Amino acid sequence: MSLFCWDIETTGFNPKKELVTVAACYTPHRQTVYQFAESDLRGNVVKIHDFIEKREAFLTELDDAPILAAFNGTGFDIPFIATAFEVDPTRVMRWMMKSFDIFEAAKRATGRTFSLNTLIGLNGFNTAKTGSGADAVLQAKAGKWKELASYCAEDARLTYEISTRKRLALPEGYAWRKKHNDRDHDPNKVLFMLVGSSYQIEFEIGTLPAASVIPGLLPNPNMSHLGSPHEVLWEDPTPERQHYFKDLPQ
């Protein structure tokens, strides 16, 4: 069962006032970009003429996907489209329940936030993002729709590349240093794994050489009963580690 990776670009951060401009969907076998906005004669960003048809086609893809994966999808992308596209709450909840959010998992692991570009650099990828969300806003205002679509599509692809790594290097988080700075520990030791409905991914604290990154997010059918895609379990569930996990920033 493959991940369905996706990303959106917007004209700002307030879904009640701003627009979704483009959305990209990526699987190993198919890539789709939806454009929801265009420039009018005065250069203003407005909804495209067939907005409703494209919106429903995109939302249906989210409905049909077995597992959704977006970088900060549960924190930004899903809430934004839920409001901007006026989506039924039950439909939104189904998306949340089947979402695998590598950003949220990394934040729990380190107690900090960082960009997709940071993860790409730490894990030895030969590619990098060519812009940021702020750049995407400027591209829309400048009417650079082709460039914006390409940028969004690349984000969705990179999210797939990051999300399908068996081992993922993360920058060491403040929460771990504060909790364990008085004892020796291996910076490359596997600390915990994130268990999803069909997958598990092991996170390592500390920067790993590229050779240590093992591709392939392996199916783990024996753990499908453990709960939602965001449930985190210790590989070595000692009382000390269980207590530490409770103190992690949410």
Q: Positions of the model-derived regions?
A:
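DEDD superfamily 3′-5′ metal-dependent exonuclease/proofreading module
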Residues: M1-Q250
